[in-house]
């Protein structure tokens, strides 16, 4: 009974169940109500007796006893005196644990501003007072007076006065007015503020003013005032008059041996505050001179600043060893802070770690656990079993037995472990497959055995990797481990839906070796009655694995109706394939293995098995496949010898001809036909091409061998060269690596990524000379340095992604939207990169799909497309489908199952409660790390593709030109003069087969709708320069060409040929150029132009010198030249349509690996504006050009209704539209990388989603990483959570305010229900960091980044956190509202009992201690009526 009573007395026990957490400002009364007494002295403990000093920082009277149930002087000991307060030492007799929760306080002799609300930008105190931070600081740190009450004087409230001004005012007005300095002055002003009147005034001001910047400034202040009004915070609480003292056990003082003490930095900081506070009290009692008191007050302010946030203002206070002391703010922020170190990641009991070794004999669901480790991990289970068996009477006896390791202990360990899964984890855990459950198998030794097939998921290898083992203790945990985390349940990768339990290396090699066919092998032509005979023939040596034989095969497959039927047929196959078919499960046809299986094939086999046979069969099959693969790769006896690296005979020839070509280009350069940049590009191209040629010849030679068949004729077959079969099977190595061994090492990159133009012509077999070796190490070092940096970058990207998407969970079945994204196949050049089937697999159709060419419906809306469906659609020739997407889902919180589609890791529709946000973040983040760790595998060899310079059609069909504008050259061909043009090739059904971008200046040999043949070259261009093409005949006139200033004449020393190169305006120096200007009356005047404002341009004039216009328009034919353009024409030269006036050299391409890729992905997700963004048309209409300003041209778009839209574009931007051309809203006007914010504004959400998905997929595709589009869409959805209010209507928002989408929609529904005007809004795109920081949950945001800023803002606004996301729930120590926790939270919400009826006085105590005022009672929360925690 006593225990029961005691529960009420313990302050931490009342609140287990709460629904929300609110953060706010603490009033002085509230701080006093938390406190158990005032700390008056800076002493800590007595150094002789080790007892805490009375009234000191560790005082037992205030904070509670040091030992359980024992007062300090020792008068009361034992449990029976519980609750007694000792009259001698004043200590309450209770548990010592209260020293972790009892707080004290310090009464400050002078008020002090809280540094967070002063210095955390924007300064809240400054904003409330409408003063600049600098001014507020001058008042607080006693450099200026502030007028509090002007009285009848001409001074204004809030005016600052220096010492001199103050003395003058006192002389003039006496004590008519009140002006003071320091925090008390600010406190007085804040106390006297009438927030409501101020807010009304601001609203009127906002309506009255028209200036954008003023509105922005006023609404910032208005928002803060309203936050104060709503939250019940009072402005004067920003200034502290009482300082709370942290419980002593949270800032411990630990005696070290040798009589010294280790202490928390906080004690030093508190001591400082107390010392200064006491000194100030004394000075005030003594009525010391003003200047001394002022100085002391300032020092008090500084010491409190240091305690709260050391180093935020001025120099940080340092301890003895020159290291800044850790203040309260440092305790919670950063990687080592409370949030990330202790709340989000904890150390786990019942765990161990050890090195891993390979366990090739294990089954897929097993792992080998060392006996000693298991004994230690399962101790409590063993103890209880020993006791239950009566083998040990007490726990102590059981412990002894276990330590002696008697025989019974091992038997019991076997029992305990049976069917008790353990979790294995390998750091870094980049995705959810980094922790999986296995059944332990006890083994001797000290290393953990791991099944080879799960290595891919863990990214583990056996070169010394370590793994951790964890034991799930509770029944629920064991159940979850078995049902969801077992390795056998994780066969498919959540990122792409492909199998991840896929054989690699030896296994692939063995299976490839089995399924290879050999000409004239022993036993060729045998006829065998069944697989048993095949076994016999192979084992007796009558036949070899690759021999072609005829076998009677008995297969069991599913027929069309889905029934299992048996078929027996005679098949021509090889011994190896028949043997392999023996382990294939029922339901897979013999065709599945009747081919040469490389890594892709084996992966496809596992996938097909999963789809046809299901999970269980696949698991068994995967194991069998592994055992078989290991067996036959051992049998194959593959080994590498130096002779296997066959250097092709025609390598010498290829090198010689390449050197010839290079010499020729050097000659051209010498004769001035090409520039230095072009020469470099061409040389690099030649070598890249040669390298491919040599590699091709080498693979040709290695991959074929000549053999004699049974008839005695010579035939060629695939070779059995060891290196070749390793690469060909996909077991290890790649063509690129073999090329370096036996071909030529090729071009290498410098550390800055540029390619060294002299390649390494030797290979590793021939060996490198010193120079070649140096060049090769040069690039390789960069690879290693990159790896270290990229790993960190990638980890940070993953962290940001998880943070932005962590609260996205599937919360309902169907949101009922018909919106979605239109999917089409992705075609790059002549290749279909991703078919429509691959893109829509596992998605839900948004609108009925019609059969092409008819009105019949092929698929109804709402169908989840599985493999069978997409195959059917492929056969029908459907080329676009609108599917549901997370981006367009209308669920308020979370996303619905229909919009998400298939759960990729399970292969069926997604379950409610699945944490799709985190899965998406992991799927995108994990390959980032993988790829970055993989940059150096090719050893810095520059993998640069030879530049494309022509379009060669692959399929016969019809050419179609899309937005290409051409002019006819006098030679008869067409020249493209538009930029975003594309040429597509259609097959006879009108389906698009190929798509090519046609650059400006390309020469086309076909027109629109012309027939083309496969292999025909339809367009070609110079890849290294960008021409400026004339569209009229005429004569060239140079304008603003000033040699030595705007253009440099470059004369080639060898040839004497000269060309003009336009200089960069930034590097022109200062000076002025005089130029003649003819005005309208024909009068010639002279004007002076600064060098940097000169704009070199080529005008075209007719024979009489009049300006020519571009055909069919009123635009003069003026061509501005950008910096770097090369002009080879002379003034007054004659040009014809389609001629090039100038060439702009293109940059040499740097090697693109994901290093270019990772920052690119980060830029896209952060929604950063590109350096030179493309300029998009703001409206649809006809283009015109208006009056130009000095550096800009004015582009005018006239809409169909006659409205015009103007835009100023810098003249140096290459405008791609011409006068009179029609543009659509959102079309590109000036080249560049599109700005995602523009795409969203002009083209809408779906186009934005398509753009981001496309760009990110391009980066990953380049690296051969498959990620499903839906993961990227999920992140995009999270980036679009916020909206900008464009018209507030009758809502309380301000124009331009950023509001959460779900919140705004809910408010609008309420407004419409009351027949009021809802707020109008536009979607807003936030980068992932910004989006994470602006989430509804302050706990989640604070634990992510910028903790101080987030908490400061949350506290002033008095925000409640409804604990919706996963992160908040982990931090407060609950199950997450996803997965199995989803049901728990739903049940909690329904039960939510009314607060227990305790006697009135106790309830009051509870709420008083919570600081909600006397018995206000709980404020009702959204979903339930549990009290809030403050």
Swiss-Prot record:
Lineage of source species: Bacteria, Pseudomonadati, Pseudomonadota, Gammaproteobacteria, Chromatiales
Binding-site residues, Mg(2+): 461, 463, 465
Enzyme Commission number(s): 2.7.7.6
Full protein name: DNA-directed RNA polymerase subunit beta'
Cofactor note: Binds 1 Mg(2+) ion per subunit. Binds 2 Zn(2+) ions per subunit.
Subunit architecture: The RNAP catalytic core consists of 2 alpha, 1 beta, 1 beta' and 1 omega subunit. When a sigma factor is associated with the core the holoenzyme is formed, which can initiate transcription.
Family per similarity comment: Belongs to the RNA polymerase beta' chain family.
UniProt-annotated binding residues for Zn(2+) 2: 815, 889, 896, 899
GO biological process, one term: DNA-templated transcription
Gene field: rpoC
Stretches with biased composition (Low complexity): 1392-1405
Cofactor: Mg(2+); Zn(2+)
Organism (species): Halorhodospira halophila (strain DSM 244 / SL1)
Pfam families recorded: RNA_pol_Rpb1_1, RNA_pol_Rpb1_2, RNA_pol_Rpb1_3, RNA_pol_Rpb1_4, RNA_pol_Rpb1_5
GO molecular function: DNA binding; DNA-directed RNA polymerase activity; magnesium ion binding; zinc ion binding
Source domain of life: Bacteria
């Amino acid at each position: 009974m006593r225990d029961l009573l005691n529960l009420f007395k313990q302050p931490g026990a009342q609140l287990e169940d709460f629904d929300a957490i609110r953060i706010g400002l603490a009033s002085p009364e509230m701080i006093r109500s938390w406190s158990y007494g005032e700390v008056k002295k800076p002493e800590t403990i007595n150094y002789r007796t080790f007892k805490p000093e009375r009234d000191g920082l560790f005082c037992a009277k205030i904070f509670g006893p040091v030992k359980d149930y024992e007062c300090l002087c020792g008068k009361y000991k034992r449990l029976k005196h519980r609750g007694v307060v000792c009259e001698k030492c004043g200590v309450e007799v209770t548990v010592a644990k209260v020293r972790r929760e009892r707080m004290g306080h310090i009464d400050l002799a002078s008020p002090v501003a809280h540094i967070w609300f002063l210095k955390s930008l924007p300064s809240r105190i400054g904003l409330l007072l409408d003063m600049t931070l600098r001014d507020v600081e001058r008042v607080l740190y006693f450099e200026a007076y502030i007028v509090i009450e002007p009285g009848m004087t001409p001074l204004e409230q809030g005016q600052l006065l220096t010492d001199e001004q103050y003395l003058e005012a006192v002389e003039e007005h006496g004590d008519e007015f009140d002006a003071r300095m320091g925090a008390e002055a600010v406190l007085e002003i804040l106390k006297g503020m009438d927030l409501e009147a101020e807010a009304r005034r601001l609203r009127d001001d906002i309506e009255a003013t028209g200036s954008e910047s003023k509105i922005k400034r006023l609404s910032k202040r208005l928002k803060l005032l309203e936050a104060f009004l709503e939250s019940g915070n009072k402005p004067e609480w920003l200034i502290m008059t009482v300082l709370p003292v942290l419980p002593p056990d949270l800032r411990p003082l630990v005696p070290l041996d040798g009589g010294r003490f280790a202490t928390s930095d906080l004690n030093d900081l508190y001591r400082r505050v107390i010392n200064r506070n006491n000194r100030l009290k004394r000075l005030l009692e003594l009525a010391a001179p003003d200047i001394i008191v002022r100085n002391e007050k300032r020092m008090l302010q500084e010491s409190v600043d240091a305690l709260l946030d050391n180093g935020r203002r001025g120099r940080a206070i340092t301890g003895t060893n020159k290291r800044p002391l850790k203040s309260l703010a440092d305790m919670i922020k950063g990687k080592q802070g409370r949030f990330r170190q202790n709340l989000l990641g904890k150390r786990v009991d019942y765990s161990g770690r050890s090195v891993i070794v390979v366990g090739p004999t294990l089954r897929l669901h097993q792992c080998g656990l060392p006996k000693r480790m298991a004994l230690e991990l399962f101790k409590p289970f063993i103890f209880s079993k020993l006791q239950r068996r009566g083998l040990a009477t007490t726990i102590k006896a059981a412990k002894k037995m276990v330590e002696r390791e008697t025989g019974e202990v091992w038997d019991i360990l076997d029992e305990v472990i049976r069917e008790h899964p353990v979790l294995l984890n390998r750091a870094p855990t980049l995705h959810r497959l980094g922790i999986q459950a296995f059944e332990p198998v006890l083994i001797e030794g000290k290393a953990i055995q791991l099944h080879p097939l799960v290595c891919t998921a863990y990214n583990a290898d056996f070169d010394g990797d370590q793994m951790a083992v964890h034991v799930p203790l509770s029944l629920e945990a064991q159940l979850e481990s078995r049902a969801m985390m077992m390795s056998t349940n994780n066969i498919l990768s959540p990122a792409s839906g492909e199998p991840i339990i896929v054989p690699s290396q030896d296994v692939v090699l063995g299976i490839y070796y089995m399924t290879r066919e050999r000409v004239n092998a022993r036993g060729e032509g045998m006829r065998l009655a069944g697989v048993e005979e095949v076994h016999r023939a192979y084992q007796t040596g009558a036949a070899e694995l690759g021999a072609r034989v005829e076998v009677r095969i008995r297969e069991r497959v599913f027929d069309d109706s889905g029934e299992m039927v048996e078929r027996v047929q005679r098949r021509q196959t090889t011994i190896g394939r028949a043997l392999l078919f023996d382990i294939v499960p029922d339901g897979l046809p013999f065709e599945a293995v009747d081919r040469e299986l490389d890594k892709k094939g084996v992966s496809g086999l596992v996938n097909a098995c999963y789809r046809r046979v299901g999970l269980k069969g696949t698991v068994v099959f995967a194991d069998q496949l592994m055992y078989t693969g290991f067996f036959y790769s051992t049998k194959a006896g593959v080994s590498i010898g130096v002779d296997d690296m066959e250097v092709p005979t025609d390598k010498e020839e290829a090198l010689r001809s390449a050197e010839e070509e290079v010499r020729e280009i050097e000659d051209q350069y010498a004769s001035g036909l090409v520039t230095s940049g072009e020469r470099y590009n061409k040389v690099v191209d030649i070598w890249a091409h040669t390298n491919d040629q040599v590699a091709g010849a080498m693979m040709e030679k290695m991959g074929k061998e000549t053999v004699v068949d049974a008839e005695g004729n010579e035939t060629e077959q695939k070779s059995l060269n060891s290196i070749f079969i390793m690469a060909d099977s996909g077991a290890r190595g790649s063509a690129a690596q073999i090329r370096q061994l036996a071909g030529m090492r090729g071009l290498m990159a410098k550390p800055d990524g540029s390619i060294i133009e002299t390649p390494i012509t030797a290979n590793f077999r021939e060996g490198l000379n010193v120079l070649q070796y140096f060049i090769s190490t040069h690039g390789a070092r960069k690879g290693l340095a990159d790896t270290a940096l990229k790993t960190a970058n990638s980890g940070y990207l993953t962290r940001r992604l998880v943070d932005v998407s962590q609260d996205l969970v599937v919360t309902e079945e169907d949101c009922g939207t018909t919106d979605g994204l239109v999917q089409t196949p992705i075609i790059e050049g002549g290749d279909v990169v991703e078919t429509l089937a691959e893109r829509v697999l596992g998605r839900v159709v948004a609108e009925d799909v019609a059969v092409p060419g008819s009105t019949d419906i092929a698929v109804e809306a709402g169908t989840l497309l599985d493999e069978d469906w997409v195959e059917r659609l492929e056969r029908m020739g459907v080329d676009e489908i609108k599917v549901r997407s997370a981006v367009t889902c209308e669920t308020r919180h979370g996303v619905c199952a229909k919009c998400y589609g298939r759960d990729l890791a399970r292969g069926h529709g997604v379950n409610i409660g699945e944490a799709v946000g985190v899965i998406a973040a992991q799927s995108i983040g994990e390959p980032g790390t993988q790829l970055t760790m993989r940059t150096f595998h090719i050893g810095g060899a520059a993998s640069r593709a030879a530049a494309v310079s022509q379009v060669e059609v692959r399929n016969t069909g019809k050419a179609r030109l899309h937005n290409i504008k051409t002019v006819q050259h006098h030679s008869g061909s067409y020249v493209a003069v538009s930029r975003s043009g594309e040429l597509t090739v259609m097959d006879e059904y009108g389906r698009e087969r190929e798509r090519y971008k046609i650059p400006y200046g390309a020469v086309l040999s076909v027109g629109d709708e012309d027939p083309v043949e496969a292999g025909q070259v339809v367009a070609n261009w110079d890849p290294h320069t960008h021409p400026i093409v004339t569209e009229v005949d005429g004569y060239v006139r140079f304008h603003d060409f000033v040699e030595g200033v705007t253009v440099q004449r470059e004369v080639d020393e060898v040839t004497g040929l000269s060309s003009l190169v336009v200089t960069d305006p930034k590097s022109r120096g200062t000076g002025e150029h005089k130029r003649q200007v003819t005005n309208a009356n024909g009068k010639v005047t002279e004007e002076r132009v600064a060098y940097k404002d000169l704009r070199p341009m080529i005008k075209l004039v007719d024979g009489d010198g009049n300006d020519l216009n571009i055909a069919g328009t009123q635009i003069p034919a003026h061509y501005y030249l950008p910096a770097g353009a090369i002009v080879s024409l002379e003034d007054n030269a004659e040009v014809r349509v389609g001629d090039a006036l100038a060439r702009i050299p293109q940059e040499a391409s740097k090697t693109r690996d994901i290093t270019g890729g990772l920052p690119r992905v980060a830029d896209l997700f952060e929604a950063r504006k590109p350096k030179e963004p493309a300029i998009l048309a703001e409206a649809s209409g006809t283009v015109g050009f208006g009056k130009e300003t000095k550096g800009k041209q004015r582009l005018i778009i006239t809409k169909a209704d006659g409205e015009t839209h103007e835009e100023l574009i810098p003249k140096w931007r290459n405008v791609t539209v011409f006068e009179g051309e029609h543009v659509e809203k959102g079309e590109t006007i000036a080249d560049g990388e599109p700005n995602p914010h523009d795409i969203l504004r002009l083209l809408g959400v779906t186009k934005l989603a398509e753009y981001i998905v496309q760009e990110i997929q391009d980066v990953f595709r380049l690296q051969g990483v498959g990620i499903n589009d839906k993961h990227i869409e999920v992140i995009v959805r999270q980036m679009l959570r916020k909206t900008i209010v464009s018209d507030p209507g009758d809502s309380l928002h301000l124009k331009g305010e950023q509001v959460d989408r779900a919140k705004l929609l809910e408010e609008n529904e309420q407004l419409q229900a009351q027949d009021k005007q809802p707020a109008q809004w536009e979607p807003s795109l936030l980068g992932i960091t910004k989006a994470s920081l602006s989430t509804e949950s302050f706990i989640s945001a604070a634990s992510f980044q910028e903790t101080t800023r987030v908490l400061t803002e949350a506290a002033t606004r008095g925000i409640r956190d409804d604990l919706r996301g996963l992160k908040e729930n982990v931090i407060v120590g609950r199950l997450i509202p996803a997965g199995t926790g989803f049901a728990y939270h739903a049940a909690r919400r329904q039960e939510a009992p009314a607060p227990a009826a305790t006697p009135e006085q106790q309830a009051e105590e509870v709420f008083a201690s919570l600081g909600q005022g006397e018995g206000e009672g709980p404020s009702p929360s959204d979903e339930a009526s549990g009290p809030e925690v403050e």
